Every structure is written in structure tokens, then in C-alpha cells.
A protein has these predicted regions:
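Bacterial N-terminal signal peptides that target proteins for export
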Residues: 1-8
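Charged catalytic cores and adjacent phosphate/nucleic-acid-binding surfaces used
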Residues: 2, 21-38, 57, 115-125, ...
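Amphipathic, positively biased hydrophobic alpha-helical segments used for protein targeting
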Residues: 9-11, 60, 330
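Hydrophobic h-region of N-terminal signal peptides that target proteins for export
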Residues: 11-19
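Compositionally biased, intrinsically disordered low-complexity segments enriched
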Residues: 15, 43-45, 335
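A metal-dependent hydrolase metal-coordination microenvironment
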Residues: 23-149, 153, 161-162, 166, ...
Length: 359
């Protein structure tokens, strides 16, 4: 009877948790693709996390995500005195809940070593037990043999890189040469590593951003400091596991954290254009024009560097609009701005041209 009395409140809590409202996210789109909101790095009690696996699904559903990976550590099992070591347990527990709530659940594990090589997530694996190997390269090889996407986690984490600067070591270069490294975390938890943008560009790797959550997500990323968890935006052909995986290997990813978007140069411009619209001038006094600039996304767009005769700075609020007043010459000559919160490199942001729509 005691067991029954204990279990009933637990199941009621799970039901109430998952029945909460889902937050619908409005993010930039890449023409011809579906934007999947993803978090590929999180933990449960089956390694060093503090929550049961099904809670990760409930949190993801409420936060408006499309896909997640529970990536408990292979080598680090601080709860093993109380919870048996089972590298597939979290995925098995979370899978039926994910199916009920239309969350794509990627099977993954975190290979956990000292730097170098550091910590790496193996995503889309089938047999995590095969990653239990003394030799690091053998562990990665086993993951790759299963079709895994290998992500280098928090390369500037100060526990492993005291100065916070990510560096490529010989082992990482070897992984790249073998085709065994596919992405690097630009953003992890509450940290970002600017040099990762250049590393990914120079080595043709995907830019990744994840929460690395261990506790309750709403507590670790609580308002008003955080409006949402960090996430990877994946531009897939369809909302399926297969399309998700294809897009990640094709490096069609961006990272959304706070009010910022980090994306490769070739993706950044179309992403901006997908949410920003300039209207037809509604006033023209012969010297100046007035037109509206609107934003359909959750991300405010922060523009700077406007030339003489146009606003020096503009912030187009999330789901908002601003009126732009500029010299009439800009009817034929676009205004060039830097988008300060769309990052394309360690020292680079997106440059765009703004002009009113034609009648």
C-alpha cells in the first residue's frame, strides 16, 4: 500500500507537468527548409543530472522544441551507488513520452575525457554500451560505425581550459582528418566561445549550441535573466529524424542564445531576410522618406553603422515595427547596416542593405 500511495502522486505530477501549455517559438526560416528547434546536450539521474528522463521531454515540449538528445556521460556515473549503470535507460524511459508529445528524441551519450580531447557527444547512436572503451579513439570509432554525429562540447570550459580559450589539439585534427568530428559547441550552458565560429568555418563543421542542463531547466534558465534556453536551429527538409540528421551533417545549423543568432555567413543573410520586411514609403516630403521596418521573429534585430542621412542605429523589436526616416536618396541607394546580434565569425557580424519596398 505504501508503494501505491507513493507512485500515485508521481504519476499525477508527470501528467500535470506534460499537460502544461507549449510555447510556440517564432524564429528565422531558411527558404525551402523547416526550422527545427533543438537541444542536443542534457543530463538526467543516469549520470550527473538531477531529474528523471521523462522530465526532459516535458521541458522540451513546453519550451517549444522539436528535437532533443539526452546525453548522459559514459565514464562519469556519480549516482551508480543508487542507480544501476545503464547507458540506454534514459532513452528507453523518455522514448514513449517523446512519441506521445511529438518530440524527436535522438539517442546519444557523452564521451567524457580530460582535455585533450575533452568531452564529445555521440548523437544518433544505437548501442551506447559499445562506447565503453579505455582508448578514446576506439570509443569514437565505435560511435562513428553506428552513423554518429560527433560534437565537441564546451571547448573553452574553464575546468579544462583555464583561460576559457578553445584550442584545437592534435587529437581534434586527427578526428577531423578521419571525418569523425562533425560539430562544435559555440554556446554551452551560459558561455559562448567566439573562436568556435572560425574553427567551424575553417574545418567545415556545424555550429552547435545547447543547454547542458543538469537540473530543472526553468530554474537554470529562469526569467527575467533568460527568455529561453540556448538551442541549435537545424534547417531540415522535413520534421523527421532522418531529415534532422541529414541537415546536421550538411552543416545547416545556427545557434540562438539570448537575443543573439550565430550562423555561417551563407545562412545568416537569408535568415535575416526571412523575418525583416521593409514597407512602401508612407510619407515623402521631397527631401526625406518615411517607411516601416517590421520583424516577425522572437529575436530583436539590432542594427548599427547607418550612414549620414539615415538613422545611425535601429532596433527592430521582436514581433514589432519601427519607422525609418531617411534622406530621399535612399529610394535608389540602399542603407548598409551591421546586424550586431547576428554573429558570423569571431570578429564579424552580418552586413545587410535596407531599402523601402517599391510601389
Amino acid at each position: 500500500m505504501k508503494t501505491k500511495l507513493t507512485l500515485i502522486p508521481i504519476f499525477l505530477l508527470i501528467t500535470l507537468t506534460l499537460s502544461a501549455q507549449r510555447h510556440i517559438l517564432s524564429v528565422p526560416e531558411l527558404p525551402g527548409y523547416v526550422t527545427l528547434k533543438c537541444d542536443f546536450h542534457m543530463h538526467t539521474v543516469f549520470s550527473d543530472g538531477n531529474v528523471w528522463p521523462n522530465q526532459r521531454v516535458g521541458e522540451a515540449w513546453r519550451d517549444g522544441l522539436d528535437a532533443i538528445a539526452i546525453t548522459d556521460h559514459i565514464e562519469y556515473q556519480p549516482h551508480k551507488q543508487y542507480i544501476p549503470v545503464d547507458h540506454s535507460a534514459a532513452w528507453k524511459i523518455a522514448s514513449p513520452i517523446a512519441a506521445d508529445y511529438n518530440i524527436i528524441l535522438v539517442k546519444g551519450s557523452e564521451i567524457t575525457r580530460k582535455m585533450p580531447p575533452g568531452h564529445l557527444n555521440a548523437l544518433f547512436i544505437t548501442e551506447p554500451d559499445s562506447l565503453v572503451k579505455d582508448d578514446f579513439m576506439k570509443a569514437v570509432e565505435a560511435a562513428v560505425a553506428q552513423g554518429a554525429f560527433i560534437e565537441w562540447n564546451h571547448p573553452g570550459w574553464k575546468s579544462q581550459q583555464p583561460d576559457g580559450i578553445p584550442r584545437m589539439y592534435d587529437v581534434h585534427r586527427e578526428l577531423i582528418a578521419k571525418g569523425w568530428l562533425h560539430g562544435i559547441e559555440y554556446y554551452n550552458d551560459v558561455e559562448y566561445y567566439p573562436l568556435v565560429m572560425d574553427m567551424c568555418r575553417d574545418n567545415q563543421l556545424a555550429i552547435m549550441g545547447n543547454s547542458d542542463v543538469h537540473g530543472v531547466i526553468s530554474e537554470e534558465f529562469a526569467a527575467p535573466v533568460y527568455s529561453h534556453r540556448p538551442m541549435t536551429l537545424v534547417f531540415a527538409k522535413e520534421r523527421t529524424m532522418e531529415s534532422l540528421k541529414e541537415a546536421m551533417f550538411a552543416r545547416r545549423t545556427a545557434v540562438w542564445y539570448g537575443d543573439n543568432l550565430a550562423a555561417p555567413e551563407e545562412l545568416a543573410a537569408p535568415l535575416f531576410q526571412s523575418v525583416i520586411t521593409a514597407g512602401i514609403p508612407f510619407r515623402d516630403d521631397g527631401k526625406r522618406i518615411w517607411f516601416e521596418l517590421s520583424n516577425t521573429s522572437d529575436i530583436p534585430m539590432k542594427l548599427s553603422g547607418g550612414p549620414e542621412g539615415a538613422p545611425a542605429t535601429l532596433t527592430v523589436p521582436a514581433h514589432g515595427m519601427v519607422v525609418v526616416r531617411a534622406d530621399r536618396k535612399f529610394l535608389a541607394q540602399p542603407v548598409t547596416y551591421a546586424v550586431d546580434n547576428i554573429i558570423t565569425g569571431s570578429n564579424n557580424v552580418l552586413k545587410v542593405e535596407i531599402s523601402p519596398a517599391k510601389k
